[in-house]
Amino acid sequence: MTDIVLNDLPFVDGPPAEGQSRISWIKNGEEILGADTQYGSEGSMNRPTVSVLRNVEVLDKNIGILKTSLETANSDIKTIQGILDVSGDIEALAQIGINKKDISDLKTLTSEHTEILNGTNNTVDSILADIGPFNAEANSVYRTIRNDLLWIKRELGQYTGQDINGLPVVGNPSSGMKHRIINNTDVITSQGIRLSELETKFIESDVGSLTIEVGNLREELGPKPPSFSQNVYSRLNEIDTKQTTVESDISAIKTSIGYPGNNSIITSVNTNTDNIASINLELNQSGGIKQRLTVIETSIGSDDIPSSIKGQIKDNTTSIESLNGIVGENTSSGLRANVSWLNQIVGTDSSGGQPSPPGSLLNRVSTIETSVSGLNNAVQNLQVEIGNNSAGIKGQVVALNTLVNGTNPNGSTVEERGLTNSIKANETNIASVTQEVNTAKGNISSLQGDVQALQEAGYIPEAPRDGQAYVRKDGEWVFLSTFLSPA
């Protein structure tokens, strides 16, 4: 709402302010002159009356301004009533009291949910503390706990007829470390059987005949060399192995040189020489394969350099060995037992492919999240609608309450006095101003009639010379103050 700005009276009887003038009353001894024309307002007789008329015109404009302001205020009040939506016998204060109670209930409910959320947050923080932080230096690959456990399960593998979780699966082969352990166990068992058979045969054999056979074998093999390093079987096995390798190499050489073929070896060698030169250039030039390989070798490094790949692999191997000890041998020891227990308590998440069982932490957290999400949305919507002292319903109520009741009943502006006080004062002032205007209009009409009569009579007796201001009324002189403010 804009401020009501009223125009100041142009003429006053007391000391004038800026932009005002004193009323020039008729003085004793002054020649009384009327208008020169029938509808003119000049002349000393008309001078104070014209000043009063100008004041009346300003008052009329001010009344129009007040009327416009009142119409605007009435429109604003109707708008306020529409915003408050107060109908029937329910008053605005009662409605505000209901809203206050609802807000108090919401605060209590929000406090309860805050306590629940704090408890949930403490539980989650405790779980996070038990899990521990991720160390990127010690573990270069980031996985979630479930993915890490899944990776460990896959590395550990499964027995025949089971899956990695130990559940029976018909026809499922063994895999991972369990598969290798089973194979090693089978090999060790077969070696034990062979050793047992050899021991049995040695015990049952004839040592004398063995001596003769050994002598015959020595004659066939020849004398023992002075520097004995390997036995005959080892050397024969080595020769057989080398023979197989030589035959494979010869076959590979034939295939490589294209034997038998049409191209001569020298042609192929020259071509290869050119290709090798090109390859050497590619290898040795700046940014070539050799330089890049050096960078790769530096990156790979060695076990004693922690930042190198080998160093990280060593750290990972050590960590995995430690993890294997921490994880446990089966589902009844180590982390596997803890994880099995946690799976029952916490429940499986979405990556497990199974819904969280009722009563598990994940199921309860999911239920709480759904409830809290709905409550948060409802509370946020209510907070937005209710607002604060400067916005929303609360802000509008505060602003309207201030606008209606004001801040200072004796203030100089409508906002300070309030709409209620201003309207009451304006009603009183308008009634008084209306009465004064009507009286002034009547007096002016009477003055105009008197002036007209004087003009027609052509004679006006002189007023008393006692220093008072007089006007003519009903054929005689009366005080101007009495004329303007009749009893």
UniProtKB/Swiss-Prot annotation:
This protein's UniProt keywords: Chaperone, Coiled coil, Isopeptide bond, Late protein, Virion
Organism this protein belongs to: Enterobacteria phage T4 (Bacteriophage T4)
Pfam families the record matches: Fibritin_C (PF07921)
Record gene name: wac
UniProt subunit comment: Homotrimer. Interacts (via N-terminal domain) with neck protein gp13; this interaction allows attachment of the fibrous collar and wiskers.
Modified how: Cross-linked via an isopeptide bond to E.coli host protein DncV during infection.
Gene3D superfamilies given in the database record: 6-Phosphogluconate Dehydrogenase, domain 3 (1.20.5.320)
Record flagged with keyword DNA damage: no
Predominant location category: virion
Cross-link (Glycyl lysine isopeptide (Lys-Gly) (interchain with G-Cter in host protein DncV)): K100
The name this protein goes by in its record: Fibritin
Record localization: Virion
